[in-house]
From Swiss-Prot:
It comes from Brevibacillus brevis (strain 47 / JCM 6285 / NBRC 100599). PROSITE patterns: G_TR_1, G_TR_2. It comes from the Bacteria. GTP binds at residues 17-24, 81-85, 135-138. One of its GO terms (molecular function) is GTPase activity. This is Elongation factor G. GO terms for biological process: ribosome disassembly. NCBIfam families: EF-G, PRK12740.1-3, PRK12740.1-5, small_GTP. Keywords: Cytoplasm, Elongation factor, GTP-binding, Nucleotide-binding, Protein biosynthesis. The gene is fusA.
Amino acid sequence: MAREFSLPNTRNIGIMAHIDAGKTTTTERILFYTGRVHKIGEVHEGAATMDWMEQEQERGITITSAATTAQWNGHRINIIDTPGHVDFTVEVERSLRVLDGAVTVFDAKGGVEPQTETVWRQADRYGVPRMCYINKMDIMGANFDMCLGQIKSRLGANPVAIQYPIGAEDQFKGMVDLIEMKAIVYTDDLGKTSDSAEIPADLLARCEELRMAMVEAAAEQDEELMMKYLEGEELTNDEIRAALRKGTIDCKLTPVMCGSSYKNKGVQPMLDNVVAYLPSPVDIPAIKGTLPDTEDEVDRPADDNGPFSALAFKIMTDPYVGRLTFFRVYSGVLNSGSYVLNSTKGKRERVGRILQMHANHREEITTVYSGDIAAAVGLKDTTTGDTLCDEKAPVILESMDFPEPVISVAIEPKSKADQDKMGIGLSKLAEEDPTFRTRTDEETGQTIISGMGELHLEIIVDRLKREFKVESNVGAPQVAYRETFRNAAKVEGKFVRQSGGRGQYGHVWVEFAPLEAGQGFQFENKIVGGVVPREYIPAVQAGIEESMKNGVIAGFPLVDIKATIVDGSYHDVDSNEMAFKVAGSLALKEAAKKCGAVLLEPIMKVEVTMPEEYMGDVMGDLNSRRGRIEGMEARANAQVIRAMVPLSEMFGYSTILRSRTQGRGVYSMVIDHYEEVPKFIAEEIIKKSKGE
């Protein structure tokens, strides 16, 4: 089967935003206008096609990023709808990794919200070209100019308005196309028909000002255009579009559009702009990978004739076909029924069937081409972040980094008979979600599950019940504390067992030092003259790393330290790897006494929005939770407080906030950094961990 859409006519885009900015509704409208859905599904009716898990339909939020394909003006647009809730950042992270461009949706009243910032930073990290769509222009308090200002000041972006709204709130009628300088006014409820009209006189001056700024931004992308602009010549509309496209793809600027997806206004112009400004797979740099044997770096450009390479970015268990592996093809072609190599794990896999997904119904296809996103059935060993490639041309593509969980709870089945079923269910859910971990506590024998927040774990427990029919009891949430060293010290680790016969002998001197936050663990070997033979060095490192997992003061992982092995000794007969491994772990225990080990706790960036009359109450409450107020601002008939608060103080906060604000306050939080726990609290935690 030949390609239906050429590579330059393919777009892989994500739709991302803060929770409730209207992402899923926007995607629903795209599917409606591109002819993929005959009836529009509403999120608040629980009928949106992109939200296909039962929990999503009940809660009206998107949890898994459903991938779907749509067609518009001779282009194929593959869309990934990502969740906006902070607990599901993993979904956003993995979507961004396989996208070529994104549309960030803003709430015209809320502007830039905390999760928008988080998602924006994630997209910065992956260098994803973006456009902004200011949605909900029809609601009370909608303010396009405020949003434009915040995108610049809070996100540090270079926003360029290419549209301007006509009216706002219940007077919102359409928008001005600033390139053509024409008004687009909607005449029917479904937004399928629009008229082009003259720009209303009261908006003309502002539109001309924004058009000037747009032309200047376009001219900056190209030297020839800049000369033309400086010499006072008019740039043609095609020149402006081409320059804006270049600036968008180079991440130098971000086109800004507006509309109201719910009221069906602005979605078709947005689709035109996605095609006009966001990159196709051939417009962006080729993906880099390494050769498994030599570790040399190679490029895999988007080309059907190249060797097959793809990245698996999501695993899902489907009630009808079993395990689905979503993957993005970077180069080459794949036919169903063929074998591929999972180069990350070194295993051969057979691709049984290939499905093109449309939210939750699927179409079977026989071939996928470079630049496509599809789902495979039949892969047994492949997990998120693995590379799939041609067996004859192995390559390992850059994978993705996932954040460590910040919260844990103990879980047990309500009936002992379900113990095994629960274990199977949890391990399947952990396969799907790299930020969800499950382990058994060695001391208590309890099953501990960890994730990104209370909602994340709630959904996991809910899925256990629905998908695996296991009812469970859940303990109180526990914070994922960390430990680190404050000071540097040189310590000795010596393990000697010599009582006749073959003994054990391992002896090292190690310098431990604290590192900057987030640097993890570093190990350096400074042994000279072979006082410790080279083959024992990895054993010392392994001994230190294994002991770090269980910490030195309260059983929490030790992070951000450097260990340098500087001296030691060995015995010709009695030394072995095991002895040096033990010596490494003894050195760490010794360091705990001299390096001033301390506890660290996750600090959350919290934003609370409420009517002004509750300000005092809410601030007092945040202060009592060891919160630091960072700032306050008025936002569309409400007050917003920004604060840094330890996660341990935020459990159950939603209930308390509801009662303090009579249900009118909302909050969101994302992890910001780790900080040392105050001494009196640390003492309590250490006592508890020792069972005192």
